Structures are given as structure tokens and as C-alpha cells.
Amino acid sequence: MRTYSPKPGDVTRQWHIIDAQDIVLGRLATTAANLLRGKHKAIYAPHMDMGDFVIIINADKVHLSGNKKTQKMAYRHSGFPGGLRSVRYDELLAKNPEKAVEKAIKGMIPKNTLGRQMLSKLKVYAGDQHPHAAQQPVPFEITQVAQ
């Protein structure tokens, strides 16, 4: 029996919607990254984009455990010498909560062209409204043991 190799036509993409209210940021990011990569599917292949579309709403109500809100820093670099910039996560969540969630998920996706293609299927919104009702997204429930 030969090993099954999925073809691009075999991939069926589904739309998932995740409510991030009171969900720990790391748990939200790992779940979203697995959905984007397609690791939840039986026909997963690491060399292909098998993932689904993921909509995350209420990104401004995401939870950070411990003192991470005031102590954890988000870094970015301009590419120029001395261009390292940092901001605390409480400031980042207040100013741009979508960016904080995207940054956490981006760190869990491969850093190559396939990863960039996977990230294009991620849609993050600060409020509970989104413009993707026509795609009929299926609610995805994240069950947490503790917060």
C-alpha cells in the first residue's frame, strides 16, 4: 500500500470563528496556529498549505496570565542600526490589540513563504463584529482547564 499524498484539489477549507474573550493569549495562539496549518486534519502534509480560515473576534479582551501584561515586552526592529523598539503588552493591547494577537500567532507559524500564505488566512478583529458573515464561519470553542 502506498502512502497517500494529498493534492491541492483535495483540500477543503472551512471558516472558523474564535471568540478570544477571557482566553489566555498563548492557548488562543496555539489553537489558531494549528487551524491555520491544517494539523487538525487527517490529510495534513507539512509541505502544503492545508489550513482553514480563522476569524478571531474580541481580541481586545484577550487574557494574559500572571504579570505578563505589565512585564512582557513586544519587540520589533526597523532594520537600521539601533532600530530595536519595544513596547509593553498592556500598551500594545490598549493601542492595537489585533497586532498583539497576530504577533503571538505569527511566532507559531513557519517562517517561510508557506507560513506567509498561511497567515493570509488569519483575520483578527478587536470587537465582536466582522465582515465575513457570508462565509458562514463555524464557531470554534477553546476549552481551558484553568486561567
Swiss-Prot record:
GO MF: mRNA binding; structural constituent of ribosome
Alphabetical list of Gene3D superfamilies matching this protein: Ribosomal protein L13
Tagged with keyword Disulfide bond: no
A Pfam family annotated for this UniProt entry: Ribosomal_L13
GO biological process terms on file: negative regulation of translation; translation
One GO cellular component, as annotated: cytosolic large ribosomal subunit
Parts forming coiled coils: none
Keyword tags: Ribonucleoprotein, Ribosomal protein
Source superkingdom: Bacteria
Subunit (UniProt): Part of the 50S ribosomal subunit.
Task performed by this protein: This protein is one of the early assembly proteins of the 50S ribosomal subunit, although it is not seen to bind rRNA by itself. It is important during the early stages of 50S assembly.
Family: Belongs to the universal ribosomal protein uL13 family.
HAMAP family: Ribosomal_uL13 (MF_01366)
Protein name: Large ribosomal subunit protein uL13
Gene source species: Streptomyces griseus subsp. griseus (strain JCM 4626 / CBS 651.72 / NBRC 13350 / KCC S-0626 / ISP 5235)
Gene: rplM
